């Protein structure tokens, strides 16, 4: 079993959206050896459910997010793969845990998009655009993890 964590600032918009989408894609692909989490690098939303914009877009696409609440990325977290939404969160992750053992990426490294950072829809209100960015990256990320961790699909 490998652990993957998506990380954004408050863990109410981008990273829970990515967690829910990734879980759905893993289910669709019948992959059971990847456990998905999400975390935030800021503590002001701890214990809150996903933002209503995130909930709305996930509901629109019939992707479950039951029981998800905001959690903080901590130095003691031990994930195999850490996937940040933007460079600011990469920097925050390295500051919180300068001795990371897991592999650290930005999500859009797994997309075919020119952008390198997933913009925060908390400020832009573009939840649909963020959904498209996350969805376009998840299968390539899954492919990478399956190969890197020598997992079986199906």
From Swiss-Prot:
Known role: Secreted tyrosine phosphatase that plays a critical role during infection as a bacterial effector protein that counteracts host defenses. Required for intramacrophage survival.
SMART domains, A to Z: LMWPc (SM00226)
Gene Ontology MF annotations: protein tyrosine phosphatase activity
Catalytic activity reported: O-phospho-L-tyrosyl-[protein] + H2O = L-tyrosyl-[protein] + phosphate
Protein name in the entry: Low molecular weight protein-tyrosine-phosphatase PtpA
GO cellular component entries: extracellular region
EC identifiers of the protein: 3.1.3.48
Homology family: Belongs to the low molecular weight phosphotyrosine protein phosphatase family.
Protein species of origin: Staphylococcus aureus (strain bovine RF122 / ET3-1)
UniProt PTM comment: Phosphorylations at Tyr-122 and Tyr-123 are essential for phosphatase activity.
EC top class, as a word: hydrolase
């Amino acid at each position: 079993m490998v652990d993957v964590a998506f990380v954004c600032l408050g863990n109410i918009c981008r990273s829970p959206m990515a967690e829910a989408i990734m879980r759905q894609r893993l289910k669709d692909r019948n992959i059971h050896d990847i456990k998905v989490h999400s975390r935030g690098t800021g503590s002001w939303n701890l214990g809150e459910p996903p933002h209503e914009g995130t909930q709305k877009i996930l509901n629109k696409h019939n992707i479950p997010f039951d029981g998800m609440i905001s959690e903080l990325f901590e130095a003691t977290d031990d994930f195999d793969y850490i996937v940040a939404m933007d460079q600011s969160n990469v920097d925050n992750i390295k500051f919180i845990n300068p001795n990371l053992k897991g592999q650290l990426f930005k999500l859009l490294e797994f997309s075919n998009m020119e952008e390198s950072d997933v913009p925060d829809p908390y400020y832009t209100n573009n939840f649909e655009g963020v959904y498209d960015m996350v969805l376009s990256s998840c299968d390539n990320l899954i492919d990478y993890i399956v190969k890197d961790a020598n997992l079986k699909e199906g």
